[in-house]
Amino acid sequence: MVVVACPNSSLVEAQMDADRSGSCSKYDYASAYSRLRSAARAAGTGVSSVLILSSPDVDSVCATRILTSLLLQDDIAHRIVPVEGYRTLLNTLSTVFAPHDNDNASSSSSSTTDVKSVVFINLGAVLSLPTTFNIPPSCTIHVIDSHRPWNLENLFATSHANDSVWCWDDGEIATKLCRQGGERDAFEKLEFDVDSDSESDSDSHSDSHSDSVSDPEDASDSNDSGSDSARSHDERQRDGSGGKRKRGSHSPLSRRRQRHKQGQRHKPRHRSTSASATRLTNAERHRYRNILTRYYARGESFGMSVSSMLYLLCESLGRADRESLWLAIVGLTSLYLSNNIDLETYETYSAAYASEVIAIEPTSSNAPTEAWSLDLLTNANNNAQEQAARSATATATGAARAQNRAVRSVISKNTKAEDADDRSIRIVGSELRLTLYRHWSLETAMYHTAYVAAKLGIWRERGLSKLRGLMAKMGFSLTAVRQNYTHMPLDLRRSLVRKLEAIAPEYGLTQLTYRGFERSLGFRTAPLGAADVVEGVSALLIGAHGIKIEVDTPGMVFASSSTTPLGNSFGANLNPANPNAQTSELFATKRVWNLGTALTDSITSAIGAATGNAWSNDQTEANGGLHVDVSSTQPALAAVASVQDVGALERAERRVATSNFYEAYRALDFSRSTSVDLLRSSVLLSEALHRKIVARGISLITNQSIRTLKNFRLAILRDGADLELFTHVDVLARLADWLTTSLRDIIVQQQASTNAQRKKQPAASTRLPFILAALHRAKDTFLVLGSTASAIDGVVQHNHFTAAFQHAASVSRARVRHDHFRTCSIHVRTSDLAAFVENVHLKIK
């Protein structure tokens, strides 16, 4: 094992255990990068020896940007490959590594490959890499991932292959997993237990826990029939002798049996006689296994953002600059806005980033203070007055005044754009928790914010009346709040935060602000908040290509595609009929988003072929138990696509996902005017996506399409003009977040009422599990996603649906495919959905 220790920084408050620091932190980020750089230079010039595999999310794109900037500074040739799922990951690495079951090709492959370093960005932590890939001895895999839990095989196994896997720690491994009596001790005790391999009861016990500790990517798709063309990657992993599918268990016993079959390279190295010749009692063995089982049963969660980890690398190398800091801020904000980290964690990191901003930005003595920073100055004044009141001496009063002046000076120097070329980062003390409020009208932004929807119930007429009443109490007219934010009267914008904080609590809106950041982009556009950048980049990852969606174009736009690829307003104002023509809009209108028609047309034709050239499918299987009705989908599924058509559709989807990643990557290049224009236009696409998501969520609530079961709530999306959009896992996850947030207060009240009737003590931390299923007509599958929210706003619960989905697929023998890095999502055949959901219902407690 090689664990890359997290460097000391203001971003990391982890305290290393002195007893275990030597074994857990032999290398740090800088030494890991130095190894990568040395291997690249040893490979020679003109050789692309670094392969970067990145998952398609905002944090990963930001981290990839930071890493590639370092590689470019060092003149290291590299290649970026977006990886949207496990099958793409295996297909990509199959061109680099030899097949795992081909022992004869192992040496030849390792000697001929030019790739010396493979960097996994936001993927790989849950995989057992040494048993999944045949890693050449000359190649090193760097795992930089925020997904948790870790696969302990990568961290603590002692095979020779594990020496090629370098896992970058964010502090959790050294402080938690390596603590005395923790997961590392349990793993090592079981790995070197001399009797564990020979005892049949040990094997059966390990297998009995496979549903709760198995790899998320190793879905229970062994029940899938041979006619299903969409196989997950683990189904194609066969051992050479028996053809039996390898288990994806995290159990060290089952992993060790795999290594024994895979040859000498994967045999454990005995460190010493005392360490290897250990005989455990049955009680000890049971206790250590329980430690590992509890670790994997915690559910899916997130650690430090990968962009923050790469920023720490920049700090360690002395290369931290404004661009890397801004990308790290955007990556952190993306985790917070997607409810992957809680408010307390975000506040801790954002405070550290605020200090970095103050330290890294140039100063200006004549920069006036912006209106939205007045709350910071007010807090500074209050703190100074309190300090002066507590002290009776003039010295203390003078010190308080000096501190006040210093804070005022720092804020003024970091909160105002100086000139047309200013690209500084500014701290926003009270960033409004409203969706795209800088680009929408205030009323529209509040309407599309899930937190506001939860408190006011905007899907009811009464909720809309409350929203307008809130505006009236603030002294804002309907005309003003329906204007674009940039067109609102200046005095209203300056007083917006103060009035919201004073009046909104009367409506239950007590957490409408948080610490945020803004970036000035000079004369090209108005300053963009970190949340705005997150929304825009996320929209590009979802729909830059491949979907047809209408966006609102602003008025008074005159665009020419001859000057830039898409004119001044990019995809919003491109005329698809005549791309070379001048286009103009005097008044706001709707246009189809378009960054080029080739990929979108390929998806459309593939879907048409999959649904048109198919054979009849009669659904005769009875659905019992929960009676999940799938019969209504049959008219639309009069035909089921052939294997070839589905394969063509999936290849088209992969091309679209790759192109979307590169568009998002390009949008974060703030040195290019075209990239800034693309990022600005992506906000229009994000607005359109939010409209679709909120409209679908309100439709589910008002039509009472959400079923309340004993242990979770269930909603099935079977129809609608925008149904295809919700087969994208990120869009479905956004809808799930909106529903859980919007219904939080209602669900908590219902649970409190039920507990009162039963005279039951309410739980200290109530989870709000939600399952959404979206029909993909062309593939005859449902995309099923599980979401877990907390009853307390700002608190994040671990997601336990991964193990529940695996267990349900195994018990129900449903045909499923688990191909997303979001482990709480899975594809289920339409005819198997009822049995699958019923078994999930029995598993979730």
From Swiss-Prot:
Q: List keywords of the entry alphabetically.
A: Cell cycle, DNA replication, Nucleus
Where does the record place Basic and acidic residues bias?
202-212, 230-242
GO MF, one term, reads: single-stranded DNA binding
Name this protein carries in UniProt? Protein TSD2
Q: Where is this region: Disordered?
A: 193-283
From the UniProt record, report the name of the gene that encodes this protein.
Answer: TSD2
Has the keyword Nucleus been applied to this entry? yes
Example GO BP: DNA replication initiation
Highest taxon of the lineage? Eukaryota
A GO cellular-component term linked to this record: DNA replication preinitiation complex
Question: Which family would the database say this protein is a member of?
Answer: Belongs to the CDC45 family.
Q: Where is the composition biased (Basic residues)?
A: 243-272
Organism in which the protein naturally occurs: Mycosarcoma maydis (Corn smut fungus)
| Biological function | Temperature-sensitive protein required for DNA synthesis. May be a transcription factor that regulates the level or influences the stability of DNA polymerases or auxiliary proteins.
| Chief localization | nucleus
Q: Which InterPro entries does this UniProt record tie to the protein? A: CDC45
State the compartments where it is located.
Nucleus
